[in-house]
UniProtKB/Swiss-Prot annotation:
It comes from Yersinia pestis. One of its GO terms (biological process) is methylation. NCBIfam families: hemK_fam (TIGR00536), L3_gln_methyl (TIGR03533). GO terms for molecular function: nucleic acid binding; protein-glutamine N-methyltransferase activity. The lineage of its organism: Bacteria, Pseudomonadati, Pseudomonadota, Gammaproteobacteria, Enterobacterales. Its EC number is 2.1.1.298. One of its GO terms (cellular component) is cytosol. It catalyses: L-glutaminyl-[ribosomal protein uL3] + S-adenosyl-L-methionine = N(5)-methyl-L-glutaminyl-[ribosomal protein uL3] + S-adenosyl-L-homocysteine + H(+). Methylates large ribosomal subunit protein uL3 on a specific glutamine residue. The keyword S-adenosyl-L-methionine applies. Keywords: Methyltransferase, S-adenosyl-L-methionine, Transferase. Belongs to the protein N5-glutamine methyltransferase family. PrmB subfamily. This is Ribosomal protein uL3 glutamine methyltransferase.
Amino acid sequence: MDKIFVDEAVNELHTIQDMLRWTVSRFNAANIFYGHGTDNPWDEAVQLVFPSLFLPLDIPEDIRSSRLTSSERHRIVERVIRRVNERIPVAYLTNKAWFCGMEYYVDERVLVPRSPIGELIENRFDGLIHHQPNHILDMCTGSGCIAIACAYAFPDAEVDAVDISNDVLAVTEHNIQQHGMEHQVTPIRSDLFRDLPPIKYDLIVTNPPYVDAEDMADLPQEFRFEPELGLAAGSDGLKLARRILACAPDFLQDDGVLICEVGNSMVHLMDQYPDVPFTWLEFEKGGDGVFMLTKQQLIDCAAHFSMYRD
């Protein structure tokens, strides 16, 4: 970004609204990629500017006319420069992301929350489960946002948050503590189901790595800051999904269900397993690539995935 723009912003912009407008203009001029919780320059600017001022996203309109100190202007401008020049996702600049309307800590150890599964949680999996779940598993938990959101949605349920990485689980545990959910959400290190105790869950929710090799090669620069461990899943993006499909029925109650996100790799899944009765879920807020299977359906199609059992 040209120095003249930086100097003008620091010296001539005075209010929160000024800084929001300037940030949107810089984002538009830079043609950055959106996809880490926002899809437009205004929301991206809000998620950068307000947290940089230690303000909530829903501040009253009249507060936006408040004047900024020099240090506040410098802090915002510095982050805008890094977002534009280095293409770092806003969430990694502020260490804040939102999921199901709640704030989470994130850094480069975990993916930025953005799963459409959040809509299912907000609707309490209406039409997908037939009773209040007592035990929920969030497989490949990352920041822990799905597990914690499920705990809010079902306050009487016990939720296990599983990931293979200790670094990831450190972030998970931080968010569990920030939300005061230590009594309800348990972080567990496991390579998928391999190291889990023999628990039967009413609901397994999973957003595993699912980006195929072709998409990995074409990812916008912003996604290069996210951990490859949380994205890449082999040539067809199904490396982990197959293992989950193979092992999930052993960990489900008789009336339990599996909900799994595979994103763009849904094409590979449908092509390779046309006989599996995936229910592909629809979302009012956008998103796709999420399927549901019951335990019985998983048992019925077990032969397709038996070679991938742990």
